[in-house]
Swiss-Prot record:
Keywords: ATP-binding, Isoprene biosynthesis, Kinase, Nucleotide-binding, Transferase. Pfam families: GHMP_kinases_C (PF08544), GHMP_kinases_N (PF00288). Catalyzes the phosphorylation of the position 2 hydroxy group of 4-diphosphocytidyl-2C-methyl-D-erythritol. GO terms for biological process: isopentenyl diphosphate biosynthetic process, methylerythritol 4-phosphate pathway; terpenoid biosynthetic process. This is 4-diphosphocytidyl-2-C-methyl-D-erythritol kinase. HAMAP family: IspE (MF_00061). It comes from Verminephrobacter eiseniae (strain EF01-2). Its EC number is 2.7.1.148. It catalyses: 4-CDP-2-C-methyl-D-erythritol + ATP = 4-CDP-2-C-methyl-D-erythritol 2-phosphate + ADP + H(+). It is an enzyme of class 2 (transferase).
Length: 300
């Protein structure tokens, strides 16, 4: 095998995000449910005989050491592999949005090069490499909607069908937010009550209508801080509210999202009306599995 083309790197939404504490090393402990959506970057991979790692930006220019490049080098360092790769990356997912675009690129790179280079690493082995790149990477490697805890490395997949199919409006304001600025803010409360997986399983996520608005599982503890630092987060929520949609922030922002009722007149971006200049609005569906699910074995 010499090449793999058109591999997706999907975004995620945080249905809720609770900060329950902080480790001695400064990392925050979270509880959240991550849900995959069908808004994706696209990556291409070709073997290089000279052993070099390179990247071609097929869209907007990216930093020289973006997460796809870092993932390729981390995989080689962990395995001793000397093979090379050329990565083509078509970037659609906005940065500083809280939807995991860079982490998803890293996960797709790990899964793809594990196959392209014939390494045969398991999911758990790839997750251990992934967490060194970013807290969200193991989730994308695992490739299933999941409850996520710890600093992001404790992943409990949800039962198949627990999250019903739904449609979401995702709004990314022009302004972005640095994750570090959110977590270092003195405004951040770090003592949320713990949310159990059994409690989430009992929540109302299976009825018709706006089934993703259970009161106990739609809070993002980072949102008040983000709104204080970035007024456009509030503006985006108000933009959704003006259209009858209940918005909330995903991740560390600045993107917000809302479920769209299953109605024929609210299924396309154009139906939501014009957004302010520089904003991105995307109508997405949730995914039950990552498109590359099954690309690595579950066990060593």
């Amino acid at each position: 095998m010499q090449a793999l083309y058109d591999l997706p790197a999907p975004a995620k939404l945080n249905l809720f995000l609770h900060i329950i504490g902080r480790r001695a090393d400064g990392y925050h402990l979270i509880e959240s449910v991550f849900m995959l959506i069908d808004w994706c970057d696209t990556l291409h991979f070709e073997c290089r005989a000279d052993g070099a790692i390179s990247r071609q930006d097929l869209g907007a220019p990216l930093p020289a050491a973006d997460l796809s490049i870092r993932a390729a080098h981390a995989l080689r360092a962990a395995t001793g592999c000397r093979q090379g790769a050329h990565i083509g990356l078509l970037k659609r997912l906005p940065a500083q949005a809280g939807i995991g675009g860079g982490s998803s690129d890293a996960a797709t790179t790990l899964l793809a090069l594990n196959r392209l280079w014939g390494l045969g690493l398991s999911l758990s082995a790839l997750e251990k490499i992934g967490v060194t790149l970013g807290a969200d990477v193991p989730f994308f490697v695992r490739g299933r909607n999941a409850r996520v805890a710890g600093i992001g490395e404790i992943i409990t997949p949800l039962a198949h069908g627990q999250l019903p199919p739904a449609c979401f409006a995702v709004v990314k304001p022009a302004a972005g937010l640095e994750t570090k600025a959110i977590f270092s803010s003195p405004l951040l409360k770090r003592a949320s009550g713990s949310a159990t997986i059994s409690g989430f399983a009992a929540a109302d996520f299976g009825r018709d209508g706006d089934c993703y608005q259970d009161a106990d599982f739609c809070r993002n503890d980072l949102q008040p801080v983000a709104q204080a630092l970035c007024p456009e987060v509030t503006q985006a929520i108000e933009w959704l509210r003006a259209r009858g949609l209940q918005g909330r922030m995903t991740g560390s922002g600045s993107a917000v999202f809302a479920q769209i009722p299953q109605a024929p007149d609210l299924g396309h971006v154009g139906d939501l009306g014009a957004a302010p200049e520089g904003w991105q609005v995307r109508v997405c569906e949730n995914l039950m599995l990552h498109p590359l699910a099954g690309w690595a074995a579950d066990e060593d």
